[in-house]
UniProtKB/Swiss-Prot annotation:
GO terms for cellular component: plasma membrane. It is found in: Cell membrane. Keywords: Cell membrane, Membrane, Transmembrane, Transmembrane helix, Transport. Belongs to the AzlC family. The keyword Transmembrane applies. The chain crosses the membrane at residues 14-34, 42-62, 130-150, 156-176, 192-212. It is a multi-pass membrane protein. This is Uncharacterized membrane protein HP_1331.
């Protein structure tokens, strides 16, 4: 327990930016869900067991349109397909996490993946507990935000337009932090070029997954050149 608390204290400061974003986005999700006639228990269930922001927002649209369960499942898989790329790149770090592994796989969101690649535990801090703490903290923020949003939204109505930009802003900050911490920026520029080209060719609806696959392939094929 002492080792876990040590790792938890080390991990918490790194998650503060996610805390702010997840609370706002979680509250937005909760408010939108109750506006469709669902109560806080549905918001809590989805945030506990689905825990995928984009999928949860898409699910609201599909549920309001009375889409079939099969359609919901297919769209969810397509929207979250990019997580496969994240999981593959984390295999080495997750392989010795023992009982934590199922939860770490479940809690690997875009933002958690970014933090795990940006920060490392201090000397003397267990990496397994550090990774677990970051994942648990981020998940807790999302659950709390969703719950508060659904409870508040049950009694008051809010204009949530523009709130989705919060997560985009967080990603920009995380990218800039990682960029400043490293001297080799080849990977960063490769990712930017691939993303821009894919956006121009495939549009906003399809570019993300294609760009991620191409990035992974490029990193595998040109690993030595990029590390020089």
């Amino acid at each position: 327990m002492h080792e876990f608390l040590k790792a938890f204290k080390d991990a918490f400061p790194h998650t503060i930016s996610i805390l702010l974003g997840y609370l706002l986005m979680g509250m937005t999700f909760g408010m939108l869900l109750v506006q469709q006639g669902y109560d806080y228990k549905v918001a809590l269930f989805m945030s506990l067991f689905i825990y995928a922001g984009a999928v949860q927002f898409v699910a609201i649209t599909l549920l309001s349109a009375q889409a079939s369960l099969m359609n919901v499942v297919i769209v969810s898989l397509l929207v979250n397909a990019r997580q496969t790329c994240y999981a593959l790149s984390m295999l080495d770090r997750f392989k010795n996490t023992k009982w934590r592994l199922p939860y770490l796989a479940h809690a690997l969101t875009d933002e958690t993946f970014a933090l795990l690649n940006l920060y490392a535990p201090k000397e003397g801090v267990s990496e397994k507990d550090f990774i677990f703490s970051i994942s648990l903290l981020n998940h807790s923020y999302w659950i709390f935000g969703s719950l508060v949003g659904s409870l508040v939204g049950s009694h008051f109505s809010f204009d949530t337009q523009g709130m989705e930009f919060v997560m985009t802003a967080i990603f920009i900050v995380l990218f800039m932090e990682q960029y400043k911490r490293t001297t080799n920026h080849k990977n960063a520029w490769l990712g930017i070029v691939i993303a821009v080209v894919c956006l121009a060719l495939f549009g906003t609806e399809y570019f993300l997954l294609i760009a991620l696959v191409l990035m992974v392939l490029a990193l595998m094929l040109f690993r030595k050149q990029l590390e020089c």
